[in-house]
Amino acid sequence: MTLDISKYPTLALAETPDELRLLPKETLPTLCDELRTYLLNSVSQSSGHLASGLGTVELTVALHYVYNTPFDQLIWDVGHQAYPHKILTGRREQMPTIRQKGGLHPFPWREESEYDTLSVGHSSTSISAALGMAICAEKEGQNRKVVSVIGDGAITAGMAFEAMNHAGDVHSDMLVILNDNEMSISENVGALNNHLARVLSGNLYTSIREGGKKVLSGVPPIKELVRRTEEHLKGMVVPGTLFEELGFNYIGPIDGHDVVELVKTLKNMRELKGPQFLHIMTKKGKGYEPAEKDPIGYHGVPKFDPAHTSLPKSSGGKPSFSNIFGDFLCDMAAQDPKLMAITPAMREGSGMVRFSKEYPEQYFDVAIAEQHAVTLATGMAIGGYNPIVAIYSTFLQRGYDQLIHDVAIMNLPVMFAIDRAGLVGADGQTHQGAFDLSYMRCIPNMVIMAPSDENECRQMLYTGHKHQGPSAVRYPRGNGMGTPIESEFTALEIGKGRLVRQGEKVAILSFGTFLANALEAAEALNATVADMRFVKPLDEALIRQLANEHDVLITIEENAIAGGAGAGVIEFMMQEKIMKPVLNLGLPDKFIHQGTQEELHEELGLDAKGIEQAIRHYLAK
């Protein structure tokens, strides 16, 4: 449903940045108010990311007003906050389609718009990319400006600091804007720093910092304190000390909701040479009281009525796999005081809220630091504890070296609870959990499990927790199938699958939650169906039996076919000279766009009807 733009008269004049730059500066506050209201009304009708964008309205307007985009290059880290950017860059009328199949991409996307300089989705990539672009811009000599906008969560990641460290050394012209909406860096900041930011006086910063050190050092009672905690004190007086030490000229913090002051500051900073760092303070959810009070709850929202003060509650029913994991953690921790649960900033999404409250001493949120999360678990395992790393499939990619080098080589008992395995739906290419079976299956010592339903998931989590080596349980986004969940824990036999349906000629080997689809297809084909359970080690005896008793084997998984579970079946059969035709069904060799999970399964032929058709087509060859 398209909104009536006549209700937003100033916004109607700014469909593109070129039009925006024609507006008088005094109209910008009105534009921001209309843009914020438009964003709220649009997302409430379509669903999507809300609170982050509400907090970056003034910054977005100011950036496009000051910088000559798309010639000047603007990069949004992660991209949750980029909805206002999409609205102002010619995509306003398409906003109702965002995150939907065939609609606007959920994040900035190069194929979608020339204003989207970098395709994003994962955090903390913007500064590295901006530096690369800035280096090239200097070589071209066209006075192109490069700006990176990064949040206070994303900037905690190691990659961001690696990039800033290099940028300070290379000294290219670029601007990093820290969108700080949590007061995480500047709790002790007062009026002095706001004044210094407005006058943009780096020399004054330096004199105050150095002069303050001299004054404090001359006072005997605190002379020793200053000597021992000099860096801490500098950080209290000047929050940008860290960034200045990395080679940036630090300005801020300033009010990120004063669009006129932002424009003045950005115009001044646009002409500065070398790496610049602007620290702005914003409020996530700005302008919509429920989102201001609950920015986490309103980070990503379903369709809702903005007139109501709360989001619609889910209808209940079948539990999500994330909640099954959360319940497992609580139940297991009641028995095992050495259980340690680690998450890289995914407490809510991974179903760990209850556990974090009931067992706070066994819960560790390491922020956006996947590499650290994995090796932290290594240390805990060496210390005699039982760590569980709760992580999305797409984010485990970032800790791959640590998985191999720090866990698997030492054969340590670390379990990975891999959420969002398979197609996640609306977040698109950057978030699909398409590769974990492929990138884990080649690692020695790994035990990899793929449950077919919620009870099997619970028992596999228990199996992995008790296993004396590295293990992984991968499960999809969304709710289970309604299978009754046994409260009692039962360890599964490692590497053993089970026959679910006996048929003739065709045997379907199902890895994971496509089992229900496989069974439905098997009814039409009178095929045998096996729930393989383990991707590694494979149930080789069961594969041999099925190959001996059937003419054709079909494997199905919600993972890339290349290198996945089905590839493992073929490798085993070729090694054993078992010459039977095998059809691998799974995700094709391409990045899968956004859409609902159901839409994507149907499009890729992975629903029951598609599986049946694929098998019939294969048999007809």
Swiss-Prot record:
It comes from Vibrio vulnificus (strain YJ016). It comes from the Bacteria. Keywords: Isoprene biosynthesis, Magnesium, Metal-binding, Thiamine biosynthesis, Thiamine pyrophosphate, Transferase. Pathway: Metabolic intermediate biosynthesis; 1-deoxy-D-xylulose 5-phosphate biosynthesis; 1-deoxy-D-xylulose 5-phosphate from D-glyceraldehyde 3-phosphate and pyruvate: step 1/1. It catalyses: D-glyceraldehyde 3-phosphate + pyruvate + H(+) = 1-deoxy-D-xylulose 5-phosphate + CO2. Its cofactor is Mg(2+); thiamine diphosphate. Homodimer. It is an enzyme of class 2 (transferase). GO terms for cellular component: cytosol. Mg(2+) binds at residues 152, 181. Catalyzes the acyloin condensation reaction between C atoms 2 and 3 of pyruvate and glyceraldehyde 3-phosphate to yield 1-deoxy-D-xylulose-5-phosphate (DXP). This is 1-deoxy-D-xylulose-5-phosphate synthase. Thiamine diphosphate binds at residues 80, 121-123, 153-154, 181, 288, 370. Belongs to the transketolase family. DXPS subfamily. InterPro entries: Dxylulose-5-P_synthase, THDP-binding, Transketo_C/PFOR_II, Transketolase-like_Pyr-bd, Transketolase_BS, Transketolase_C, Transketolase_CS. CDD domains: TPP_DXS, TPP_PYR_DXS_TK_like. The keyword S-adenosyl-L-methionine does not apply. GO terms for molecular function: 1-deoxy-D-xylulose-5-phosphate synthase activity; magnesium ion binding; thiamine pyrophosphate binding. One of its GO terms (biological process) is 1-deoxy-D-xylulose 5-phosphate biosynthetic process. Binds 1 Mg(2+) ion per subunit. Binds 1 thiamine pyrophosphate per subunit. Its EC number is 2.2.1.7.
